[in-house]
Amino acid sequence: MKKFTGSGVALVTPFKGSKINYPVLQKLLDFHIENETDFLVILGTTAESPTLTSSEKKEVISFVVNYINKRIPIMVGTGSNDTKQTISFSRTAQRLGADALLIVTPYYNKPTQNGLLAHYKAVAKSINLPIMLYNVPSRTGVNLEVDTVKRLSKVKNIIGIKEASGNLEQVKSIIDQTHEDFIVLSGNDDQVYDVLSLGGHGVISVTANIIPLSTSLLIQNFRAGIDNKEAFIKFNKLHDMMFVESNPIPVKRALEHLGFEVGKPRLPLTKLGAKHNRMLLKVLRDYKLVDND
């Protein structure tokens, strides 16, 4: 199986007060090693990367790279809405031992497709690591269109895309119009089956923070020829709960209920509201992830 296919977890960043909680981060890494997560994605949206300082980001990369010690691949989110800054941080991640980079489309400033093409080509030219494109227009305000992805797929070190547009027709077109080695990952937990069925290669998952083994086995079984759509659908209520408020608010609360002291999100995000927390607990109990006490 190629690197960066299967089940990748969009890992949270645990906090204790104003600091990153490295003992808990180590526990989370062990949890994923033990439960067959195929690769890690750190410093992405779920990791609250916009609220981490530059020095904190470097510390997280160094800690994860050193602790994992090549046991599973590590992808680092290095994207921003400034090409120069993206290049600089991508070089830092490369120097610190990242195996690949996840680079989101520039957000807020809404570049044209030509701007997106130039941005990614400039970054790819500046580093030697594999790059995974990341399309999430609901957050960035810009869609990475099929023709742009097709053109970028011809760049040697652009290896694939995390596709979170929610548009399965777009996903299908990307798969159909790019070469066979181009990796297409679902960026939405509730669309993993659909993306795999279209010829995709896995997921970068939020829900895998709490059910890593189930997420991994679903994809392993599908790739082994077991086409069981109902097995995927079974987890939809859990996926829905992970987005009842802005990610990663619910998943961090879920991890707290599972015994991982990941702490509250950093402002401007806040802890999960009381009503939603009651709903979350019920769903976690329904899935037998926490006790019924």
Swiss-Prot record:
SUPFAM superfamilies linked: Aldolase
Name of protein: 4-hydroxy-tetrahydrodipicolinate synthase
Phylogenetic classification of the source organism: Bacteria, Bacillati, Mycoplasmatota, Mollicutes, Acholeplasmatales
Compartments, as annotated in UniProt: Cytoplasm
EC number(s) reported in the record: 4.3.3.7
Active site: 134 (proton donor/acceptor), 162 (schiff-base intermediate with substrate)
Molecular function GO labels: 4-hydroxy-tetrahydrodipicolinate synthase activity
Residues annotated for pyruvate binding in this entry: 46, 204
Subunit record text: Homotetramer; dimer of dimers.
Domain of life: Bacteria
Pfam families in the cross-refs: DHDPS
